[in-house]
Swiss-Prot record:
Protein name, UniProt field: Histamine H3 receptor
Gene name in the database record: Hrh3
Tissue and organ expression note: Expressed abundantly in brain, most notably throughout the thalamus, the ventromedial hypothalamus and the caudate nucleus. Isoform 1 is largely predominant in all tissues.
Membrane topology type: Multi-pass membrane protein
Major localization listed first in the record, in broad terms: membrane
Modified residue annotations for Phosphoserine: S439
Organism encoding this protein: Rattus norvegicus
Amino acid sequence: MERAPPDGLMNASGTLAGEAAAAGGARGFSAAWTAVLAALMALLIVATVLGNALVMLAFVADSSLRTQNNFFLLNLAISDFLVGAFCIPLYVPYVLTGRWTFGRGLCKLWLVVDYLLCASSVFNIVLISYDRFLSVTRAVSYRAQQGDTRRAVRKMALVWVLAFLLYGPAILSWEYLSGGSSIPEGHCYAEFFYNWYFLITASTLEFFTPFLSVTFFNLSIYLNIQRRTRLRLDGGREAGPEPPPDAQPSPPPAPPSCWGCWPKGHGEAMPLHRYGVGEAGPGVEAGEAALGGGSGGGAAASPTSSSGSSSRGTERPRSLKRGSKPSASSASLEKRMKMVSQSITQRFRLSRDKKVAKSLAIIVSIFGLCWAPYTLLMIIRAACHGRCIPDYWYETSFWLLWANSAVNPVLYPLCHYSFRRAFTKLLCPQKLKVQPHGSLEQCWK
């Protein structure tokens, strides 16, 4: 997001003299430094373009990603991709030579697109945070709206409209309203660059309000998860069934890992809410064993039933055979099985929500780290008209801001199992076919 002429970085004196620009922008870099900076900028461009292109290709390759909340991640990837494909490449020769050589018309277009994309990235992060907030605090109504793709598209379009309205009209019309352009020949930056009142208003809408919003959403998610965890633990102590003294101890089903998948050794395991109460799914056997499964329903099992359990897992009571009437003990067992199923399902959902809060905290923290320096320096610089902030600090701050577009796609495979699996499908399709459960870890090593 280029907001200033780069002469302060190019010229040893740090002045914005029009004579230097007219002379071609004397560079303050040696040939070696120019090569190093060009290589770093090229690396940032490649990382931004390839990373976000991979996110977009994942939507084409994996139809399971096309949910409402993931459409917002796609919208963010489109913004970041265009930053790397259009905004940064046009700025590289400008920052290395100190002179804009692409004409006034392309300068206007570049500024509009640059401000638009960076603002849309911010608003997309707010939208993603709000969507996760609804998924945790209003889960029932949220799940009912998951199939409404048009609602998601409307929200995505609204993000782009608001992002354009924030800076676009000002960039296009400022020079006509003020009676002429104040930008020297060979430079390209917004006319309002030193207007403190406009910048403080725009910064409030572009950074301070969004940052407070995502902080509120994530704090609400965290508090909601904490409350639900506390209620689950209290409920387990009050109403949890006691296993019989002769029952064999069995570890509970492993919760999802931080990647959202089962650990090694549990490749076939699935949460119990995928099965009916009357079906024996993975994890039910462990629950039955912990609760003392068998016809005795709490009494010592006979040698026959004990050996049968050891060889075939926990069996259903004989009274549950087809055509027979369930006994009181079998009804009690079914009730306890249902309680175990509900407990494991709730534990799975809490683990999923904790993962959501963790991933959002990472995204928001990086967002604040990348945007706060630029926003604060922009306001201070405008207040003192560029005399109190060294130009290289300002230059560094918005390169840090651009780096956020390269970092965002890295967060998806780290925090979202669905994206990680889609990336594996694109990058390691053979491993995914041969080892569908264990290939994710191997592919990303």
